[in-house]
Amino acid sequence: MKILKNDAYIRALLRESVDITPVWMMRQAGRYLPEYKKIRAQAGDFMSLCKNTQLACEVTLQPLRRYPLDAAILFSDILTIPDAMGLGLYFTTGEGPKFHFPIRMKADIEKLPIPDPEKELRYVMDLARTVRKELAGTVPLIGFAGSPWTIATYMVEGGSSKIFSRLKAMLYTEPATLHLLLNKLTQTVILYLNAQIQAGVQSIMIFDTWGGVLSGENYRIFSLNYMHQIIEGLTRENEGCKIPVTLFTKGGGQWLEAIAETGCDAIGLDWTTDIGEARHRVGDKVALQGNMDPAVLYAPAPIIEKEVASILGAFGKGTGHIFNLGHGVHQDTPPEHVRIFVDAVHRLSKNDAASG
C-alpha cells in the first residue's frame, strides 16, 4: 500500500501518536450537501445511486472537497445485504426502508441465500476499488456493515420500527429461529467485509444502530456475541497494514467494558455517554470515537467550538480519540456549520498537542 499522506485516523485507531485529533462524520456524504441532492436527483432513487459506481464515488468524495476530513467512508447502506438476499429493498418518501418480502417464519430464513460479495454485491466492491483509486492515498477509506442484530430488525419488521414487536416476539418465543437468522447474517457480514478489505478499504466500522433497545443479557447474547464472531473472522491486515475495526452500538454506553473485550480497536460512542468516563472505564484497551450531539451543528460558531473544546477536554491528553458525532449528521444541518466543526477539532486539538 502507498503510504497515506494523512494517516491520523488510522494512527489514532491504533492508539499511536498523532499531531491532531482526526475527525470525520457518520453520514458525511449525504442530504445536508446541496451537491449531493443534485446527484441524487440525477440517479433517480437511493438504491440506484448506491449501485451506480461513478455517482456513488462522486458522492463519497463530495464532503472531502468541502472539508479537511481525515477519512472517507463508502457511500452505501447497511441494508445492501438483505437486498442481496432477495428481500426486495425499496424506499418510500418519509417512511424509510421497506422490504417486499420480510422474514416471517423459520422457513423464510432457511431459504435465504448467502450472497457472493463479488457477484450480488459487486457494486459495493467496485465502489471501494474506484474510491481508493480516486483518493490516491490522501486519506484512508472506511468500509462498513450493519451488525447482524440491526440488519435483522429491518428484515423481520419489514422496515423501520420504534418498538420491534415482531423481532422481540421472535427473541422471546422462538430464540432458536432468531439465532438461525443471526448466524446466517454473521457469515454473510464476514464475507462482505473481507471482500471490502480486499477491494481496498483500510478500516472497518460495524454499525449496531439498534443494539441499545436490548436488555443487558440479551445484548450480549443476540448482538455482541455475533459482532465478536465477525471480528474474529475478519482479515485484520492487508497490503502490509493493520485493518482497524470500530464497533458502534447506539445506546450502548452501559456495555463499554464488554464491547472492549471483543477484539475491536475502537468503540463508537453516542452523545449520551461522557467520553472522559468512557476512557476511564476502558483504559488503554481501545480507542474511542465520538461523540458530539449532531444537533449542536444547528448552533452558532461559538457554541459549536465550545462543545468541541468540552469533548476534547473530557477525553484528555494522549492519543486514541477520533472525533465524530454521536450519530449521523442531520439532513437539515447547515453545511457551513460543518466547516466550523471540523476546523475547530483540528485547531483546538493541535493547540492541546502543542501545550501537552
Swiss-Prot record:
InterPro entries: UROD/MetE-like_sf, Uroporphyrinogen_deCO2ase_HemE, Uroporphyrinogen_deCOase. It catalyses: uroporphyrinogen III + 4 H(+) = coproporphyrinogen III + 4 CO2. The record marks D77 as: Transition state stabilizer. GO terms for cellular component: cytosol. Its EC number is 4.1.1.37. Belongs to the uroporphyrinogen decarboxylase family. This is Uroporphyrinogen decarboxylase. The gene is hemE.
